[in-house]
Amino acid sequence: MRLANSMITTAGLVIATILVTNISARSQSAEDNVLSFHNGVDRSGKFTFPGLTWEHARSVHADRQFRGKVSGHVYAQPLHWRAYGASSSMLLVATEANSVHALDAISGETIWTRSLGTPIDHSLLRCGNIDPLGITGTPVIDESTGTIYLDADVAESSTPHHRVFALSLKDGSTLPGWPVDIAHVLQLGRQVFNARDQGERGALTLVDGSLYVPFGGHLGDCGDYRGWVVGISLKDPGKLTSWSTRARGGGIWAPGGISAVGHSLFVATGNTFSASTWSDGEAVVRLAGDLHRSNDRRDYFAPTNWHALDMQDADLGATNPVVFDVDSQHGRQALILALGKDGRAYVLDRNNLGGIGGSLAVAAVSKRPILAAPAVYAMAGEAFVAFQGQGEGCRSRAVDGELTVLKISGGPRPTISTAWCSRVRGASSPIVTTTDGQSEPIVWVVGAEGDGRLHGFRGDNGEPLFDGSAGPVMAGLHHFQTLIATKDRLYVGADRRVYAFAF
């Protein structure tokens, strides 16, 4: 991968009072809650809203009355929360200033703000490209308790710390037993975790009563970092489990972090260093909830040229694995897709990852490295995967950005083909909306570090539906940024503000 606490509560909002009164342990999911990165542990990036049809997409417009002010740079995806029985909802936005903002989802006014400590100045790190460094990985919400979990890079006495917080959505207060200092607790178990060299860009996830946090390095691959997954028991936050790569490097740094299905976690690792034998890099790894190491070929995959990928910094870790099912002659086929910086797509059997060289299908699908997070949706029993990159099967010769959609068909040897391509200037992570789970799919993407606009395309043929030309150019969009959808709005997080689009 080269590439003390303060709380400010804004009073006087009746809508905020209604909202926080309804947050309780009996909370249950509203239809448009967005609790984690890409709207679920599978990281599909799919949202279902009957009202967002192809026709309605043409009339999407910027909500210029939406305030949406936050402090600091924004790399993490916003989340959306409506408590059980509440008539209003909130956006949760975490920033590199180590602040968490709860905003009213309609007006954008502040409900509460929580500061989690001093972010890390770049001068305290050996390398990296985020300054200051605070909250980068997308948090996750536990709907059963009304709690948001996140990892914050905190500087204390000029020493970097990774601290995992649990905050009440009622008022942003820290729950008892939190935060957890990752390096300190692991050290108690005689494990070495170098908080200065470990970066936390990937999204957190919740599975079976545990919080899982992925770690990689910083841009520049400096210091003694490894790919880590740390599990924290929600009932006993002082109880940690962990898995790490055997070789140095192998970071888990994609914005989607950890994908999950059932009781299984899936991660993609980056390039390792000085590994003469395969040591967990350039891989898709399945982990059980206790994070024990498995040497079973069914629980890992790496390309046969893993060592060459190491040497070229062409790792699989730039995108998170995505899980999906397709139709085949023998019924539904459980698959997983990995996309590499080498421009290749690897289709794996989700129940048997196959070990080294064990993919079901592999194809060159991009002329340039594939980064960020893909989105996946289904049509007619086949899977479609959208990513921002210069597609190998695309006719255009765009060099400043392209949206590529692959079609994956089932079978003993699944086929990978290019469904359609469209030019989009930028580098972000797309999402997909449908009206019922499959009908009228729309691929949405923002021109992060490009044209700064929102774009929407028909998912079946790539026809442009919305190009954002009548709306604002969104300033402060960082690469890998994605957006979220609710039943009547789209939201995009950017430096010091959130943009809202109504439909």
List each model region and its residues:
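Boundary at the C-terminal end of the N-terminal hydrophobic targeting segment
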Residues: 25-29
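N-terminal secretory signal peptides that target proteins for export/translocation
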Residues: 1-6
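Mobile, glycine-rich extracellular loop/lid and propeptide segments
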Residues: 30-291, 297-327, 333-355, 366, ...
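Inter-blade linker and blade-boundary elements of WD-repeat/beta-propeller domains
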Residues: 357-367, 416-420, 470
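Bacterial N-terminal signal peptides
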Residues: 9-22
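Detector for outer-membrane/organellar transmembrane beta-barrel domains
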Residues: 400-405, 410-429
